[in-house]
A protein has these predicted regions:
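Peri-transmembrane interface segments
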Residues: 23-30, 41-67, 79-82, 90, ...
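Alpha-helical transmembrane segments of integral membrane proteins
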Residues: 31-42, 59-75, 112-120, 155, ...
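C-terminal membrane-exit region of the final transmembrane helix in multipass inner-membrane proteins
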Residues: 1-5, 14-19, 23, 76, ...
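Selective transmembrane-helix segments that form parts of the transport pathway or gating/packing helices
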Residues: 4, 25-26, 105-122
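Short helix-loop junctions at transmembrane helix boundaries
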Residues: 44-56, 117-157, 168-181
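Interfacial "coupling" helices/loops that link adjacent transmembrane helices in transporter permeases
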Residues: 71-110
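Hydrophobic alpha-helical transmembrane segments
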Residues: 5-16, 59-64, 94-112
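Membrane-interface helix starts
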Residues: 19-34, 149
């Protein structure tokens, strides 16, 4: 019974730290959502461009979206890790596992990244419908735009895969944080 109480208080500390990390780093929360938004909107929109514009326009949108998304995500997650190195080191001193450290520091961003993906999906759909139905309604030869579930699912699968690989890489970075180095500072 005592072990369950300890485990419960341990989990509540990790959950508290996760929430506190999100609350104290509101700008980083925005950038995580923004990176996911960019990935979602630009990848899905780029595949629609071959029907609405040209393949070259689609490729340009895809490259711009991916560069923007990866750069933003890389900078945001690096900032989160670097800003919490002492916290991570202290958690490791107190016996928390790498998984618990990752859950406390990075875990709160997962749901937010998925929310960003959903917002990006809705945005690209709304923007393309606006363009096709209102802006170019009088232009001859503009095809009707329909939401492409297949592209959305492919984009979502790619996003989840890439995001989880990045989180794994950063969890390995957390594992390499030297307690001794932090204590000397």
């Amino acid at each position: 019974p005592n072990h369950r109480i300890e485990k419960s208080s341990e989990l509540s500390f990790v959950e508290y730290l996760k929430r506190n990390t999100l609350k104290s780093k509101k700008a980083l929360v925005f950038f995580i959502i923004f990176a996911s938004f960019c990935f979602s909107a630009m990848t899905q929109m780029s595949f629609s461009m071959k029907d609405l514009s040209s393949e070259m326009m689609g490729v340009m949108m895809l490259v711009i979206g991916l560069v923007l998304a990866f750069t933003t995500l890389f900078l945001a997650i690096t900032t989160v890790i670097n800003g919490n190195t002492k916290t991570i080191a202290m958690m490791r001193v107190f016996g928390y596992s790498q998984k618990e450290c990752c859950r406390a520091i990075l875990g709160g961003y997962r749901l937010l990244s998925y929310i960003g993906f959903i917002i990006g999906t809705v945005y690209q759909y709304g923007l393309l419908r606006l363009m096709v139905d209102i802006v170019f309604k009088d232009v001859a030869g503009v095809p009707t735009y329909k939401f492409d579930f297949t592209t959305m699912l492919i984009s979502l699968a790619c996003f989840i895969t890439i995001y989880e690989i990045m989180m794994y890489i950063y969890s390995e970075k957390i594992k390499k944080i030297s307690i001794k180095e932090i204590m000397i500072e």
